[in-house]
Structure formats: structure tokens, C-alpha cells
A protein has these predicted regions:
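Secreted, periplasmic, or luminal enzymes acting at the cell surface/secretory milieu
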Residues: 1-106, 110-120, 126-128, 134-138, ...
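Intrinsically disordered, low-complexity Pro/Gly/Ser/Thr-rich segments with frequent PxxP/GP/PP motifs
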Residues: 133-196
Length: 302
């Protein structure tokens, strides 16, 4: 929902002649976290599992205005999709995950050139988080797949952009992707600690790391690992590594500062402004999908 939305009482509250300083406009980002691939791939994930009314669509919600949401009608090429000069296979051969985030985590992927041409290959690493009953009850939103990091073959041997190292047919190379595990945590506005509310949390459950030619390939790999009966016709090219987290973890401090809710007054629902904003939720895709922002009256509190 982007555009120039004007408060119903804009003329009464805005006396500035400078457009940069005027306070007559507002915007409600009803899409929540579901922007770009995080929307399309998460809704696809839920449609495969027939949850959250993911396959049900309201008028105007699909490209053709239909009543059924279908990924193939929405996306031509997924985020991260690319065409390379050869074909490659991938295999996750090693993973060292430090869930505390105190040290860097590493995932090593063995890449083999299975084609006939020498070429480079980009390795994309994604992760799928558990979407729990707690998340559904409290409105903690999570995308079904998210990019963790990426790497390329030949990088370890290259000294400059001109010094390109290609992987020859039949050859293999290990590509190691590093990341900080706390970047995978989700922000929970309800988490209480140290007499404040709001923190990053990592819930107990199974975490699936996946590679693939783009986000859709990765999410299909995760689905096929978890629900093979539902993915009989899918042929993803990625590889999957699963690691279980036994208990919940929280991140309550960063760089010496306490983590807590600080921007809750940015939510228009915090004010009695004439309408209620509904934010998109994977708990009910069809009935929370943005259909336009209602008229809003600026209050003295704003």
C-alpha cells in the first residue's frame, strides 16, 4: 500500500507551505514482513500444506482477479533464480551452527560441475524456521524461507575481478558460507525480560538449511524433505540439512544496550483515528490481505 494518503483533517493540522515539512500524509505498511519473495514463497509453502487459507483469494488479490491463489500465476522467476554456463550439483557436507551467535556459523557445500562447460556457480543458502502454535496465537510472523548467505566457486583462488577461476567439468569444490545465527532470530513484541517487553527469540524446533537455484527451489527442497507425499511431482535441485534446537533462546542485549519495544507508537492502531489497520498474517492469508487503507483522522496524540 503505497501512495499519497491524506488525513481527513489535513487542512486543519497542516499549516506549512514547505512540502518536505508538511504533515498531511500517512502510510500503513499492511504487508508486514511479507515483502517480495518472503510473501510469495511463504504463501506457496502454506498453500502446499493447505493452511492459513493460503489458496483462497479475494477479488483483486490475484493477477487475474480470481478466487484461487496459485503460485505459478503469480511468479515467473523466483528471487535468486539464474542461468549459468553449465549444470551443477550441490551437497551440504558440513555444518557448524552456533545458535548463541557468539561465534560465526559455517555451512559447507560441495559443488560439482555435472555439465560439459567450465563455469562458475553461485551457492545460495536459505533457512526455514518452525512456525509454531505460539506464533499463530501471538501474531509472531515468520517467512517460510529466508536467505542466510551466499558464496561462489573460485573465490578462494581469485585475486581480482579479472582473475576468474572456473570449475571444470567433473571437478568439485567446497564453498563455505558464514553467518551469525542470531540473524535468524525473530523479534517478539511480547517477550518480557528485565522489566521491559520485546526481544529476539529462537524457538525450539527443527531448522532446515537448504540450497537451490533461488528461493523457490530452496523452499521446494525443504517441503520435499518434510512432506514427501505432498511434493511427489517436484524436482528441486537443492540440498537440505536439518538441525534441531532443543530449547528456546532469547537475545535481550546488543552492543551493551537492552533490546525492547521502542517503535510501537508507529502503529496507527495505537490511536483512536477512525479506522483499524489489518496487517497481513500467514495465519489467515485470505482475510488479512491488504485491500486498501481506510480514511484516517489525525489525533492530538499523533
Amino acid at each position: 500500500d503505497y501512495g499519497a494518503y491524506v488525513f481527513t483533517n489535513a487542512d486543519d493540522i497542516d499549516t506549512s507551505s514547505n512540502n518536505a515539512l508538511r504533515s498531511r500524509w500517512y502510510l500503513a505498511e499492511e504487508e508486514s514482513i511479507y515483502i517480495g519473495y518472503k510473501y510469495y514463497e511463504t504463501r506457496y509453502f502454506d498453500s502446499v500444506l493447505d493452511q492459513g487459507n493460503a489458496s483462497q483469494a479475494l477479488t483483486g488479490e490475484t493477477k487475474d482477479g480470481g478466487k484461487v491463489w496459485d503460485y505459478d500465476n503469480e511468479v515467473s522467476y523466483s528471487f535468486g533464480y539464474g542461468v549459468e554456463g553449465s549444470t551443477f550439483s550441490e551437497e551440504i557436507t558440513d555444518a557448524k551452527i552456533d545458535w548463541s551467535g557468539e561465534t560465526q556459523s559455517e555451512v559447507t557445500v560441495k559443488v560439482t560441475n555435472t555439465g560439459e562447460n567450465a563455469a562458475k556457480h553461485a551457492v545460495q543458502l536459505y533457512v526455514s524456521l518452525p512456525y509454531t502454535d505460539y506464533d499463530k496465537e501471538t501474531g509472531l510472523e515468520k517467512s517460510a524461507i529466508q536467505l542466510v548467505g551466499y558464496g561462489k566457486t573460485g573465490e578462494a583462488k581469485e585475486n581480482s575481478f579479472e582473475d576468474v577461476v572456473l570449475l571444470e567439468p567433473g571437478e568439485s569444490e567446497d564453498v563455505t558460507i558464514t553467518f551469525t545465527a542470531t540473524d535468524i532470530y525473530s523479534y517478539d513484541v511480547n517477550e518480557k525480560h528485565d522489566n521491559v517487553t520485546g526481544a529476539y527469540i529462537l524457538e525450539a524446533g527443527d531448522y532446515y538449511f537448504a540450497t537451490g537455484n533461488g528461493a523457490h527451489d530452496a523452499v521446494q527442497s525443504v517441503l520435499k524433505e518434510q512432506y514427501p507425499d505432498k511434493m511427489k511431482d517436484a524436482e528441486p535441485t537443492g540440498t537440505v540439512y536439518k538441525e534441531a534446537v532443543d530449547s528456546k533462546r532469547t537475545l535481550t542485549e546488543s552492543n551493551g544496550s537492552t533490546i525492547q519495544n521502542q517503535l510501537t507508537d508507529g502503529d496507527l492502531n495505537s490511536y483512536n483515528c477512525g479506522t483499524e489497520v489489518t496487517y497481513l498474517s500467514r495465519n489467515d492469508w485470505a482475510h488479512t490481505f491488504p485491500v486498501g487503507i481506510g480514511e484516517i483522522t489525525a489525533t492530538e496524540e499523533m
